[in-house]
Amino acid sequence: KVKKIMSSGAEESASEKKDPEITPGGSTVYRYEDQSEDNDPKNLFPEIQCVYLDEIEEHLTKYIAEPDMVFHEIVSELVHIDVHWIKPSANYPYHILVTSGMSDLPMQVPDEVENKETYERAELMVVLPADWKIGEEEFQDDNNYWPVYFLKRLARFPHEYKTWLGYGHTIPNGMEAEDIANTGFGCMLLLPPMLSFDEDFLELKTKDGNIINFYAMIPVYR
């Protein structure tokens, strides 16, 4: 079961201008509301697609392995999100799923962030157990599909709400951080995948001079 999401640690959206909430631990919480149908960016088709697709594939091949398959999106809103699948191997005994397309457009990073331009583009990834069921048929079951759903949902999130996602941001599954599918997880935490992959993998410098940061999507309990 997947709910509308809100972000902790992200900039406020254009549709929500209230003062942010502060948790007892000092974290900032921003809530995002649906926009009117006329202004809803979800109704916009991508103006550009697959800007860095080839460079991302080359980056994955260089530092991890060549993707075994790409789950191509048929119908896209805002940005075209594909998911690259690297199957388990001796070096990496787990499934690796990585987005491409989130970085097609820059995110709206707050001006107070130092070197903000280096955080404007990102892609997301998740690592799954070797016995995880992956495939078009298997994804008909939400218990198998939810990691891919959240990769794609979060990849669109900053573009939909004119905000950004980055290091340490947490995104709950709805206002109450409800359980996701058949798990006890209720939130997603974004961190650089530095424990699983080479440090040089964490950042891709594109041919046009931009920087794409890779963040691991880590499910956490409420």
Mark where each language-model region is.
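Short linear motifs embedded in intrinsically disordered, proline/glycine-rich low-complexity segments
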Residues: V2-R222
